[in-house]
Amino acid sequence: MRRQAAAEQSGDRSPHSKKVASYKTAFLQGLRMTTNRSKCASTVFIAVILSGAAVPHVSRVGAQTSQTASITIDASKVENRISPLLYGQFLEFMYQGIKGGLNAELIRNRSFEEAPNIAGLSRYWERYPDDRNDDYALAFHWDDASAYPPQRPKVDTGERAMKEHSPRVDARDGAIQRHGLYQARIPIRAGLEYRGYLWLRADDYKGAITVALESDVKQGEVYASADINVIAGDWRKYEFTLRPEHSDPLAQFVILFPGRGRLWLDQVSLLPGEAMPGGVRRDVFEKIKALKPAFIRWPGGNVAQDYRWLWGVGPRDERFTWVNLSWKNELEPSDFGTDEFILFSRAVGAEPSITVNVEGRGATVEEAAAWVEYCNGPRTSKYGAMRAANGHPMPFGVKFWEVGNEIWGDWVRGHSDADTYARNYNRYARAMRAVDPSIKLIAVGDNNMNWNRTVLRAAGENIDYLAIHHYYGRREMAGDPLNLMARPLFLERFYAQVEQLLREIVPGERIKLAINEWGLDLPDERQYSLESALYGARLMNVFERSGNLVEMSAVSDLVNGWPGGIIQANRQGLFVSPIYLVNQLYSEHRGDKRLAASISSPTFDTSREGSDVPYLDAVASRTADGRKIFIKAVNTSPTSALTTTITVQGVIAGSQAEIETVTAPSLTASNDFARPDAVFIKNKAARSGRSFVVTLPKHSVSVITLAVR
């Protein structure tokens, strides 16, 4: 992920008159769609987007007072295929994306690696019942001399190794009976089973310990508790189960030390019994599964150039806590590693796409090849045996591998010029394919054509996909929100230029584009707004029109993250953004082939992105069985609905259409934790046939489904 919006390609701005002409030509050419006739019943899907920020001028269909439009589809003509991989997702170790959003683990800083407070307790942990306890009778010490596990395999990052810590607990005479430590803000539900464990090393401690879920406002009110008999000696794992009798979004998890003596505590865990494969929260899991992602990209993003995969395999409690150099130097637990990611991806129906570290933070080509062997090698191989020992004897069969992330950017470790990256790419490609020749490799591309040209010339024969990322924000909009609504059409022309470059350097149509990060950098109140969804929907229409080239795409980010995860999750709940809703609509209505279509629409002008930009953007596609047509339509007008005549040629359409729409009274409308359903998908039925009329609300995204034969 880039820290700023993507730079324009070199020499991209032409004189205004040429720009206007190119908009008209590119847009009209891009919207002609067709499909083959089918004798069986079939359905057509139409998606329409109306932008919400412009005042129309005299358009090709009449004066600005006339807000009518038309879509004419020729189902006998196919313009291009649409990749089944087109709608994927992107997941990164970023802020609370995984450790506080995706992961079901309820205990924060469970390995006690964060710096301690004045009481000697690591971050998120506090004395119980409060700081008035007798410090002498119950003392805590953040100890780096003893921690679990006692030893870990070394992974050389070229940095000073981070010491492992655990709290040493000294319980002496004079302490009150119910004393210990706790962690606050633990959301619990009545009747749900919570499975936990902790590791203890007992020196001369005598007695039991107690774990409990309690009220944070009614001190001492216990929802559930369990006693653990402590056995003297070296590190030992103690498991427990808690089933609270009451629900509480802000409960406390308490560990009490009623005995006397010294012990060490480490690796505390508490997971709800409903956790999904990979240790993922059930509510987040269900929202992701509803998106029907074709693939999920991980671990980054920028952080891919920080991450060392060996940190995240093996027994959960023996993994590293590492410093995330990309995102505020936060400490990251390794609970969600390779095994968990793959299990989670497959459980939601997605193919895993893994980004390997290229020369960042001490990473090597041998390490990348070893990662491929861990995932895809036989159990008789060195790293396949490691995978089998971790509980997965059969190879995972990971198909998609990305070789580095945004190497051209000085914000990532291992960044370089294009020549150096191309040489490194070839080394990595040879080593990784020597392990598994069947894998598909994704190379780092850019919005700068000079980078792409250099990489393709030197490494094109080894590339399956070229990854390009798009971010657009406040700086690029230059105070004109209409620029946002027009920007996807600039990218449509850019893809045509990339395609021309590919055909010049690499004969045939073998290399495809992966737009596996796209997003916006707007103020929060607009980042999650309907306005953002209009931009996203128009861009996804561009992806479908560019289907001969663009095969993979993913919005940034999936959960929390930066600049605007489409699922926003905190410990008490979640909401989805309007961009999530249009992602869901587009993914659910995936046609196999794009049909020829012509569109007539009012237009608007912008300060940076050209003139005569149509308010209406639409694509039509047909399912593989020929029984449905989907029309995806975006109305970007901020003020006017579009009365739209839809004509379908080359098939016989059914008498009723299904229309699903994302809109709201205001362009700035958004969801939040207090109002998670302020913006939602609205469904209605409408009369249809060979020619019919629909009203596309102002600033809206609609998907129209037609049964055809």
Task: Describe these PLM feature segments.
Residues 1-2, 11, 15, 40:
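Glycine-biased, low-complexity coil/linker segments
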Residues 64-334, 351-355, 363, 369, ...:
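Extracellular and organelle-lumenal recognition/adhesion modules and their flexible linkers in secreted
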Residues 227, 612-653, 659, 702-705:
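Carbohydrate-binding surface patches
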Residues 266, 394-413, 452-491, 511, ...:
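Aromatic- and acid-rich polysaccharide-binding/catalytic face
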Residues 326, 330-334, 340, 427-430, ...:
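Glycoside hydrolase catalytic-domain groove-lining segments
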Residues 357, 387-388, 429-450, 495-521, ...:
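Aromatic-lined carbohydrate-recognition surfaces of secreted/lumenal glycan-active proteins
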Residues 363, 367-372, 446-471, 518-532, ...:
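Substrate-binding cleft/loops of secretory-pathway carbohydrate-active enzymes
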